[in-house]
């Protein structure tokens, strides 16, 4: 039981570190859906959204 808890905790911590770096924040100002072109130029993928007036891209 103790060993399985350690393995589960280790997997949880590793997955948090992997998925926590899944965003790229830019300093480009945006409104609405204008982040697609910004993200395509920054990271090569047109997947992003405008959060608090700044583009956040998702690779």
From Swiss-Prot:
Keywords, ordered alphabetically = Disulfide bond, Ion channel impairing toxin, Neurotoxin, Potassium channel impairing toxin, Pyrrolidone carboxylic acid, Secreted, Signal, Toxin
State the superkingdom: Eukaryota
Give site residues, Aromatic residue of the functional dyad: 58
Q: Which cysteines are joined by disulfide bonds?
A: 30-50, 35-55, 39-57
State any single GO MF term: toxin activity
Q: Which GO terms describe its cellular component?
A: extracellular region
Q: Which N-terminal residues, if any, form the signal peptide?
A: 1-22
Tissues and organs where the protein is expressed, per its UniProt entry:
Expressed by the venom gland.
Q: What task does this protein carry out?
A: Blocker of A-type voltage-gated potassium channels of cerebellar granular cells. May also inhibit Kv4/KCND when coexpressed with DPP6 or DPP10. The occlusion of the outer entry of the K(+) conducting pore is partially reversible and affects both open and closed channels. It shares the same target in rat brain than BmTX3 (AC Q8I0L5) and AmmTX3 (AC P60208).
| Homology family | Belongs to the short scorpion toxin superfamily. Potassium channel inhibitor family. Alpha-KTx 15 subfamily.
Please give the name of this protein. Potassium channel toxin alpha-KTx 15.7
Q: Give the originating organism.
A: Androctonus amoreuxi (African fattail scorpion)
